[in-house]
Amino acid sequence: MKEDRVINVFYHDRLVGTLAMTNERKAAFEYADEWLENGFSISPFSLPLEKKVCVPVKEYFNGLWGVFADSLPDAWGQLLLDRMLKEKGHNIDNVSMLDRLAIVGESGMGALTYRPEWDMPKQEKLSSLDELSEQCQKILNTEYSDKLDELYRLGGTSGGARPKIMTKIDGEDWIIKFPAHVDGKNAGLMEYRYSQCAKQCGIDMEETRLFPSDICDGYFGTKRFDRKNDSFGEHRIHMLTAAALLELDFRQPNMDYHQLMKLTKILTRDNKHDIENMYRRMCFNVFAHNRDDHSKNFTFIYDENNDGWRLSPAYDLTYSTTYYGEHTTTVDGNGRNPGIKELTAVGTAAGMEKDICTKIAYDIEKCVKNELDGN
């Protein structure tokens, strides 16, 4: 593959700026002059709206700033992409990060797009969910799948580790997940039940569904929060994970909920609803045993109507463990067995009243026990 040394970044067809590969294989970024006049900072802490060339200093994102790394697929999508590139005769060692952004092109998560775009397979027919799930297992367990192009088209630019596709249902954009090889056949049902419980706990989530299957208990699906339909058609929403905002390696346990609450407070300009919702998510993750609460599982979305940021709807809420037996994000320094004491300490430090923090924590603990324990 011919390496793209320069690539342009767009937001709703407006030129945001340019990425260029340095000799040190880092992607330097510079805002376009017009964007500096009437745009916004696409990454408030890392890329202020200033006329200068910004070169990444951390190595977590393979020479990219976090905001652009958010556009790239995670484990599942990267596996699909690498398999497909090999199948088409490319040496993936020669594929740069700018090449990968060009491959993402218009199809990535969020609102940022990249040009020139690398042409990807286009296929109109959608196989059944059961067939796609079986093809996912082939990819995970072997080097072969006769649906590779279709699976990449449907899920090759998605985030997360589990197999998934991105598709339209009744004109709306959805993500549908399939079990990974380490999951049981009830993985979809479990995540669906977790989503319903989370909503009962007052946590903001998009619409979720359990799609039927003949080979497992069903496939979990959720409507995408980075796509909205309005009177002008489909609208893409700019989003940033906490990992990208803080330039953190999400694979390492390097964050505490104190940081997440502070981040929410600063970024949303002290939006009380969002601060409380982040607190509720922390409580839910603790009581529902969701320990895979890393920094890419918390996202903020840009509200262009109000020129500000909001906490996104929650996602990836399900039973999970870590190899080290603790939460990836600690709670007041405690990752192994945090409880009411640690939860309220985080909430009060963020400016919430202690009585409210305590009540929310106990209410969520009770709801989780009633809805999820023993199942």
Regions found by a protein language model. Give the residues of each.
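Phosphate/dinucleotide-binding and metal-coordinating scaffold of catalytic cores
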Residues: M1-S295, T299-N375
